[in-house]
């Protein structure tokens, strides 16, 4: 088979297994497939895997650090690893294109390499983590949905974020409340900065705005 797919909502909902081995022909882990599998500690990600669905591993105690996602994987769904409280390190493949809303929020991830080729980062994708530094690749100019990019990585630890050239807008609430943020570049291509994009960044002492910037939001 190719899919570990949901069945009436959740395939392995609250499953009581510690380790799972997926066969090499699995291409998709479906929505809520391992939702709150509260005893799950370890599983393999086959090289055939192309997508991880929404809420696939929501609130599971995965203890694979680093969590190595395979080359060939292109999409991580919304809330896929949200509330995985034991997760402290993730290695993304060079093939990843999309990271969904809150995909890694409320984890203990302290570092992540976002590869060139990544095209989209969802709303609160790294909210409430332990990230200290983030570099957004030049290929990634699309942030979030609805409240675009709000609280992209709101946490107590983020100190530095590097934004890509070609970015035209810093969205609403982008790094709002990142109280330890000391350094952020604003690319010369930025035209608009949204409301509360940098609100409550109390450790940020210096900013350079591009000459061509057209609007600066409130807060």
Spans of features found by a protein language model:
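Structural signature of tandem-repeat unit edges
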Residues: 1-2, 13-28, 38-51, 62-75, ...
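Consensus positions within tandem repeat domains that build extended binding/scaffold surfaces
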Residues: 10, 30-33, 53-56, 77-80, ...
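Short, charged, surface-exposed secondary-structure boundary motifs
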Residues: 144-146
